[in-house]
Amino acid sequence: MRRREFIAFATSAIFASPRVFAQQSGKIWRVGFVAHRYEKFYDPLFAGLRELGYVEGQNLVVERRYAEGHAEHFKDIAQELVKLNVDAIIVVTTPAAMAARNETKTIPIIHPAAIDPVGTGLIASLAHPGGNVTGLAVLNAETSAKRVELMREVLPGISKGVVLWNSANPANSLAFRETESAGLKLGVKLLSQEVRSPKEFEAAFAAISSQHPDILIVVQDALTLEYRKEIIDFTLRNKLPSMFVGKEWVEEGGLMSYGDRLPERYRRAADLVDKVLRGAKPADIPVEQPTTFELAVNLRTARSMGLALSPAFLARADLVIE
């Protein structure tokens, strides 16, 4: 495995001495954390909070709640956290963010992976969010086009593919449309395959197989990300060349990914949590965007699929798993 240095999110100045504030305020902070299930790439968020002086068991209580792939549970989770009067709510998927915002207009909500937050109505604009939601946005148009371009570079003869996406997440509609549009511009027809819950994956896999696509592109959100093992196993069984967003997929056997790095995204979210705990209003905290992206390739998977990747292509990759 080799990795090239790359720059994470551009950071902005925060209030001075956050550790001193967190440790000397005398307050026990209570923060909600909402996801489908635990993932290791969330750890930098909590490590970042510790670095900033918020230590679980001392001055921080984290109320972790997991929906286990069932988005309909987010409403009850949000209501519970509001009743607990938490100081902030961290959400990792748009349906959870919308559920939380529907339950409270005062508790700060931090969304580290917001897809089209303006289009979904979570915020008014990236520069001036308004309301009680802020976080980090996911770029779609540019990166969606780049993923299709990379797949066509590896497989120049492709004409048909499938996009797997979670339609229960309203933010993903834009991600699918932009991916579909990018494919059309490159002469690749991309068909839609929706899932809305974990129980729908097997039927989705069967439907994809029946289409006999040249490639698969997966729209990443909390559901697809947290069920990536099942998706990767499907692509390996069927020798289906696939493109993902984060290197986590490639490290676990996926062919290729292009996107920003999740650990840095969640570490940066800790700084935003610190800001709101210190009194900053989410309405006044600009939603940040990634500035640098990485290409990851699993060479073992490529070989198992009979793909010969050129030295020039591999030289451009930030991460190559031999």
Short names for language-model regions:
Residues 1-322:
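Short hydrophobic alpha-helices and adjacent helix-cap/hinge residues
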